[in-house]
């Protein structure tokens, strides 16, 4: 049985965007499902645009998403001698030829074709030259067949066929000696034994040229699966104007990697009506044949909903660790306050991102917050002073300070004073948190502890007395 080998081959000319991440994810899932090998290859033949910073960003994005690779990263820039060797093989076998046409001549041919109403393509001027022209600059072209059909069965799109007379004699080596993309990708996939190529559907038109190269070199043609692109809400191709498109930007906005993975895989693939998938679920259930043929529309609200789910159901200890940098960005030392895991537990239910959780946690670590003006007008009236005094006295005399015992004290005060719970809880919440929107007041008090709770109640009492 042939070993299953898949690859993700990004160009390091920018960050890892969500479209590339989804392609990587589909390749990774199929490799893991079929117990195959997942290879990372960096396509950096465009030396002018490729940067180490982009390579680092791609690797960081892959690692954050948990898409581990079995081989690589391989760099095309390290393989130029290999490509030259294969160019020479094609020249020696007559399957490639040197083209001496100048850029000006080619442009004139193109303009003439357009004037004649023909599709611009190389006219084969140098295809049958008898010999070399020493010292004259040249490119190397692949001698494509002019008759017949090149077809393949795309795992997503089905049967796709191209008439060979529509295909150009592809340039495989530029005049400066560097190889072209369509050539090197075939050499890499062939020599690395890639069995399935999953990539964006903007590569469909490259596929017949690449298949002809495989056949000319005597290598087996891999299976192809062309994934539809991702669109914004306006049905235009997803870009920066639609919001964040970089994977690490979502990390910095407080998203969890499992939420983005879950969202991206569902953007084009489905398994019944299920919405929530762990990585283990995905490996078991994923099928490239179940990826839809139409473009997926990126829905930030759906991603936010998924992220909220993963925060709500996440391990508080892990979330606490992830929350630390967000707190530090806000000038908070998480070691200088209540237990962070306990803090997280009170915020999981209502936080949609780690950024929201960090903002919601600030009151735990700061006493110098100001009170919400509307809340002050409504709740911090002179009549609330005896209530604060009673809470302080009851907490001081209570040996136990759990959320259950705190709740019992609130109930006692309500019964004694003939008040509703909100009439006691809201002034207390303002004293402890600065406003009326906060987690359960009983849990907040337990996390802050008796001493800090009473300090904040006394501060609020002094505020009310000052009027």
UniProtKB/Swiss-Prot annotation:
Listed name of the protein: Glutamate--tRNA ligase
Q: Does the keyword Ligase apply?
A: yes
Gene name of this polypeptide: gltX
Cellular component aspect of the GO annotation: cytosol
What family does this belong to? Belongs to the class-I aminoacyl-tRNA synthetase family. Glutamate--tRNA ligase type 1 subfamily.
Q: Where does ATP bind?
A: 240
Reactions accelerated catalytically: tRNA(Glu) + L-glutamate + ATP = L-glutamyl-tRNA(Glu) + AMP + diphosphate
Q: Does the keyword tRNA-binding apply?
A: no
Cofactor binding: number and manner: Binds 1 zinc ion per subunit.
